[in-house]
């Protein structure tokens, strides 16, 4: 849902837009996590079809990772996550990067760093502020943009990404507290939805001067694995995000609205998981569900 367009049209007197906004507001529920100014994020549960979640569960149960090289999957996850951030390295060059440890370009280094970050998460049990700071150091080692606002822990300056102006640096401690209270809290029982909320919030607060997108994607997969969905260690969600990058950024932008409603981003992540699982199963010649383009169905 594009709130900016609807709110503009409602201000211009469009009855349909006004009515749609009123209905969406009435259907919204507060989430147990607040933005930098203390407003609760919201979502609209009725805009997330139960059939989508059921199909995801069906497909996940049929995934066989015995025929998937997990190491290669980690390499490809690192590659696609960095391609989203502008790395020019091609997939044909991955062999030289991982086998010969080639670091000729910034993109090469970004990919190797992201690979190292996955390995770090695999052996680290803690999920707290210190873990994120170490993760940031690994991801941006030798390739950090905006080092002038790196700060002692978090960024020390204001950051604007597209139309999003991240919270002021002095509000980041509060945001980080919100993030981990939600992360460790017994709140949203559906792991895919909770992973989407965590992903959005991390990108929203943008705690570091660089590497936030890569870290958010790492944390998404990591959270799913830690929720008992171990097969995601062999899947590459960033591949699907890379292939649908404009929709990824549009979903983030649509989730910046006066209602604090992040349903658009939750829908995007669920569709990403669905499409990724469907592709993997198709490659394994397994046809578990009839493909649905959920983008056309989401209200």
Where are these regions (language model features)?
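FIC/Doc superfamily catalytic core
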Residues: 1-299
